[in-house]
């Protein structure tokens, strides 16, 4: 398993540990795995090499019938989250039902973590895009936090796509790179990551080698 691969995990929260120099290090506690392999996709059949892994045991009422059959075919119980991991190399060292754990990583490794950012709801242009806003007084009325002009009049006659305006903020896919593994606790499937990672507490994450 020399090829770089990742596993699914769940953010449990943040704490701090003390390094060898005695300084406190902020870390994010992540439950990484165990992730059984549900399906192996190959170039010959699907057109590309990939592993389909699962994480977090789920209830029958939360899993569709098609996915229930998919898990049953693999001889596995039901899971809440499923993820596909593309690989370039050979898949001979993997088999359906094989479990991937935090043993894939080592202390000091650099990893990248993908998750969904914390949702902020509907926000104005000042908070969402850091706009300056209008004057507080002297001729300014009811537009103190307005976005301002959003385009010309006759030409082009419409608002360009991508214009920064008020709207929903957060719950977007975010990837943070070059995060360092501070500690690994295999008996609890716990991995400690230096610094913060995307998403709220209990959200799902995908952790892969940098």
From Swiss-Prot:
The gene is rplC. GO terms for cellular component: cytosolic large ribosomal subunit. Gene3D superfamilies: 3.30.160.810, Translation factors. Keywords: Ribonucleoprotein, Ribosomal protein, RNA-binding, rRNA-binding. SUPFAM superfamilies: Translation proteins. InterPro entries: Ribosomal_uL3, Ribosomal_uL3_bac/org-type, Transl_B-barrel_sf. Transmembrane segments: none annotated. Pfam families: Ribosomal_L3. Part of the 50S ribosomal subunit. Forms a cluster with proteins L14 and L19. It comes from the Bacteria. GO terms for biological process: translation. One of the primary rRNA binding proteins, it binds directly near the 3'-end of the 23S rRNA, where it nucleates assembly of the 50S subunit. GO terms for molecular function: rRNA binding; structural constituent of ribosome. The keyword rRNA-binding applies. Coiled coil: none annotated. NCBIfam families: L3_bact. This is Large ribosomal subunit protein uL3. It comes from Lawsonia intracellularis (strain PHE/MN1-00). Belongs to the universal ribosomal protein uL3 family.
């Amino acid at each position: 398993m020399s090829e770089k691969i990742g596993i699914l995990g769940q953010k449990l929260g943040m704490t701090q540990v003390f390094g060898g120099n005695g300084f406190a290090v902020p870390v994010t506690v992540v439950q990484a795995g165990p992730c059984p392999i549900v399906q192996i996709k190959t170039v010959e059949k699907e057109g590309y090499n990939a592993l389909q892994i699962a994480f977090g045991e789920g209830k029958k009422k939360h899993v569709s019938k098609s996915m229930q059959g998919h898990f049953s075919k693999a001889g596995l119980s039901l899971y809440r989250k499923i993820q596909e991991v593309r690989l370039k190399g050979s898949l001979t060292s993997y088999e359906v039902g094989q479990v991937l754990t935090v043993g894939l990583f080592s202390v000091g490794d650099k990893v990248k973590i993908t998750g969904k950012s914390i949702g902020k709801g509907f926000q104005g242009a000042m908070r969402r895009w850091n706009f300056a806003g209008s004057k507080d007084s002297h001729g300014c009325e009811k537009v103190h936090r307005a976005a301002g002009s959003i385009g010309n009049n006759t030409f082009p006659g419409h608002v360009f796509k991508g214009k920064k305006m008020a709207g929903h903020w957060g719950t977007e896919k975010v990837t943070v790179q070059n995060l360092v593994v501070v500690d690994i606790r295999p008996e609890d499937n716990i991995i400690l990551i230096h610094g913060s990672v995307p998403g709220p507490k209990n959200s799902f994450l995908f952790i892969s080698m940098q």
